[in-house]
């Protein structure tokens, strides 16, 4: 009897936690009116995670613990859309919008319909998806794909905070109804600040070009835990399946907000072209101040009965259209071209421009990408050039106004030597860019490595800015990141703009950085292709720098998410002549060259075994199961090979299980795995 009361109390606590967590999630992300701190929110979530781990029977399909991620999927099965997800026809001028409005008016008048109100919404630059809810609970999420068939990415969409896992109770005349299947369509996107933060965690050569590319790549990641940390958002713009099929589109957007969705809030019911044109003009100016990218305005007839009347072509509906904002452009004069050297030696041409206003800010520099792009443009010093900003953080030069070329225009002298150290530059076969091979002696590369080492996502050394690093390198005070930890206050006080207080702050910040994790240090070392996520995997698989240095290319490639290219890059880094001295300095500086606080093994049942998980586990997510193996002396690998010691097969295990059986490897079930714990 006592046991039943306890079970009821635990079930009620879990239900209350789920309601509270989703309420606070909605307040934070959708309404931007948080009521509690991040710390208190995390405590609620951790308590629910604890309850569900101790009592798996309490887990529900709409539990917010699913947002944390952890499930790993091998593939994204195809799904058929209930109705085709058509793309919209584009227009690029107000004149074309007027033509669309007139055309729609004629078609409706032919049917005896005079009302033609339109809803104007911002067009988000993201990835279109469809969400299916059954009895108010999210059951499926899919990409648009080819319009008729997309990919099932439910496991990843569950991690997006603005995707409600259960629809909120609706006190509204536009009820969703009981037992109904409701479809919500919208766009998954990444905010500007989150895009910048993500790129900051990635090696220079692996950075995303824009937020849309980052979003598309993230949605197809196989590890939902990695999707969760990338902070995607979902904006809803379509609702189908409500009780009254004639509910106007404007009211459907309001209903989506009531149900817990983020709509952006910037939509308007327009009575005619004058109001449409005003909406377009307003957001052409104000869009640059939004926290996300928007590249236009979508116009839809408000009366959904007219949607059926007008129908659609094979590609797009006749009742809606997208107005695409022209990329913001400005004309200015090219003053000079300078060549920058990155921390990995890549040489990038940068245009220095006569300052000009563009998209709400003053622009004086612009990227030219690489030498081939410069040749394509035919650019010369003194030219009038057109620069463009269409969502990118850095504007780009798109063309030269050759008819305005001055008589004294000069050719751009392409360097044959590194502008920082005069070493002859080289170009690898198949590569677009040139680079400086003087890794050890090039001051520009050293400056880049120091700044990367000190950056927020690496060792997070406060007060170590670009101007100070430039002086440290120029005066020979640092030759690698290890030298930072042996700087003395008197040395720093002698530098420009460095008084006693500033010098003291730098030394204190360096000392505080010693407490950063081993995984952060691995990222800070700046190994080519090793971003934050890869550094974490390396730290798990090789718990000390000595173990990592001793690992062969094959052993490295066997680690989760590390293939032969990254493995080769790691080996090449350790084999570089200067690395041995750097590691010695880091040891002397008492930096974390091993995993923090190694715990004594709970048992040795997995000691020395390389373990592969395949299929879905019932009682563990992939991350927690991996931790259990690591705590017992094992190592997690992602691929099956002759060296694999153990394969744990869950539900729907696929090709990895087949390969393991062919190789005669030891394969166990989840029950046998738990017995080994």
Curated annotation (Swiss-Prot):
Catalyzed reaction equations: NAD(+) + (deoxyribonucleotide)n-3'-hydroxyl + 5'-phospho-(deoxyribonucleotide)m = (deoxyribonucleotide)n+m + AMP + beta-nicotinamide D-nucleotide
One Gene Ontology cellular component annotation held by this UniProt entry: cytosol
PROSITE patterns the record matches: BRCT (PS50172), DNA_LIGASE_N1 (PS01055)
Cell membrane keyword on record: no
An example Gene Ontology molecular-function term: DNA binding
InterPro entries assigned: BRCT_dom, BRCT_dom_sf, DisA/LigA_HHH, DNA_ligase, DNA_ligase_AS, DNAligase_adenylation, DNAligase_N, Hlx-hairpin-Hlx_DNA-bd_motif
HAMAP family given in the database record: DNA_ligase_A
UniProt name for this protein: DNA ligase
Gene: ligA
């Amino acid at each position: 009897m006592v046991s039943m009361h306890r079970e009821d109390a635990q079930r009620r606590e879990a239900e209350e936690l789920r309601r509270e967590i989703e309420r606070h999630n909605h307040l934070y992300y959708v309404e931007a009116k948080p009521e509690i701190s991040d710390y208190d929110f995390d405590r609620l979530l951790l308590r629910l995670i604890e309850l569900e781990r101790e009592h798996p029977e309490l887990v529900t399909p709409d539990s917010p613990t699913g947002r944390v991620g952890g499930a790993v999927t091998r593939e994204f099965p195809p799904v058929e859309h209930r109705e085709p997800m058509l793309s919209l026809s584009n227009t690029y001028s107000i004149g074309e919008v007027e033509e669309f409005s007139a055309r729609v008016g004629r078609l409706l008048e032919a049917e005896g319909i005079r009302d033609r109100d339109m809803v104007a919404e911002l067009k988000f630059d993201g990835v279109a998806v469809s969400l299916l809810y059954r009895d108010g609970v999210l059951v499926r999420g899919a990409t648009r794909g080819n319009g008729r068939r997309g990919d099932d990415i439910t496991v990843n969409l569950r991690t997006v905070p603005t995707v409600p896992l259960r629809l909120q109770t609706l006190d509204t005349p536009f009820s969703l109804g009981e037992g109904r299947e409701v479809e919500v369509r919208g766009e998954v996107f990444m905010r500007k600040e989150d895009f910048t933060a993500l790129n900051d965690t990635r090696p220079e050569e692996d950075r995303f070009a824009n937020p849309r590319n980052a979003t598309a790549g993230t949605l197809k990641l196989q590890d939902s835990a990695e999707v969760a940390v990338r902070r995607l958002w979902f904006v809803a713009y379509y609702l189908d399946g409500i009780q009254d099929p004639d509910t106007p589109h404007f009211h459907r957007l309001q209903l989506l907000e009531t149900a817990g969705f983020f709509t952006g809030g910037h939509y308007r019911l327009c009575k005619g072209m004058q109001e449409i044109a005003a909406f377009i003009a307003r957001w052409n100016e104000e869009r640059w101040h939004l926290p996300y990218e928007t590249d236009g305005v979508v116009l839809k007839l408000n009366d959904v009965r007219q949607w059926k009347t007008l129908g659609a072509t094979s590609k797009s509906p006749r009742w809606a259209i997208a107005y695409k904002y022209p990329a913001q452009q400005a004309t200015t004069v090219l003053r000079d071209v300078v060549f920058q050297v990155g921390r990995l030696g890549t040489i990038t041409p940068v245009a220095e421009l006569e300052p000009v206003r563009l998209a709400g800010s003053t622009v004086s520099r612009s990227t030219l990408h690489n030498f081939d792009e410069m040749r394509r443009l035919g650019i010369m010093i003194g030219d009038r050039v057109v620069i463009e900003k269409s969502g990118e953080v850095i504007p780009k030069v798109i063309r030269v106004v050759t008819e305005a070329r001055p008589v004294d225009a000069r050719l751009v002298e392409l360097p044959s030597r590194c502008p920082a150290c005069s070493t002859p530059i080289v170009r690898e076969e198949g590569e677009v860019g040139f680079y400086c091979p003087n890794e050890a002696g090039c001051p520009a590369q050293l400056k880049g490595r120091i700044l990367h080492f000190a950056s927020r996502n690496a060792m997070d050394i406060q007060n170590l800015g670009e101007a100070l690093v430039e002086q440290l390198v120029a005066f020979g005070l640092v030759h690698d990141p290890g030298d930072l930890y042996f700087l003395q206050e008197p040395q720093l006080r002698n530098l420009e703009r460095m008084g006693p207080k500033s010098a003291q702050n730098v030394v204190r910040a360096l000392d505080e950085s010693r407490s950063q994790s081993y995984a952060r240090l691995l990222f800070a070392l700046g190994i080519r292709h090793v971003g934050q996520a890869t550094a974490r995997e390396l730290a798990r698989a090789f718990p000390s720098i000595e173990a990592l240095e001793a690992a062969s290319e094959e052993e490295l490639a066997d680690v989760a998410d590390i293939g032969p290219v990254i493995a080769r890059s790691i080996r090449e880094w350790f084999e570089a002549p200067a690395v041995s001295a750097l590691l010695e300095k880091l040891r002397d500086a008492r930096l974390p060259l091993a995993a923090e606080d190694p715990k004594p093994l709970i048992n040795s049942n997995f000691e020395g075994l390389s373990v592969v998980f395949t299929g879905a586990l019932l009682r563990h997510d992939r991350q927690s199961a991996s931790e259990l193996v690591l705590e017992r002396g094992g190592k997690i690998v992602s691929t099956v090979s002759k060296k694999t010691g153990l394969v744990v097969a869950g539900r729907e295990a696929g090709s990895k299980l087949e390969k393991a059986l062919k190789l005669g490897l030891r394969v166990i079930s989840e029950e046998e795995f738990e017995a080994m714990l």
